[in-house]
């Protein structure tokens, strides 16, 4: 399960808009919001794109997308 709180923080800190992210991922803003609310999951290719666009380290990526403990 995605740590959406950490992901939203990373998005905010990057200064990238949700519209830009959705366009870059090739999905609608609605689909992005569903992923940000853990209604649907991010695909592996989307995680790679987010890592690059948001300038995440491998550790940050792992904490956001692959951490077992999510509050």
Label each PLM-derived region with a short phrase.
Residues 20-22:
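Short alpha-helical "recognition helix" segments of helix-turn-helix
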Residues 45-60:
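DNA major-groove recognition helix of helix-turn-helix/homeodomain DNA-binding modules
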Residues 6-10, 14-15, 59-71:
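Short, charged recognition helix plus adjacent turn
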Residues 18, 29, 47:
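Helix-turn-helix DNA-binding elements, focusing on the entry/boundary residues of the two helices
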Residues 27-42:
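Recognition helix of helix-turn-helix/homeodomain-like DNA-binding domains
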């Amino acid at each position: 399960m995605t740590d959406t709180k950490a992901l939203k923080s990373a998005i905010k800190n990057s200064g990238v808009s949700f519209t830009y992210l959705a366009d870059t991922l090739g999905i609608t803003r609605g689909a992005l919001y569903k992923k940000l609310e853990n209604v649907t999951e991010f695909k592996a290719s989307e995680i790679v794109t987010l890592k690059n666009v948001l300038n995440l380290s491998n550790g940050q990526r792992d904490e956001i997308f692959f951490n077992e403990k999510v509050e």
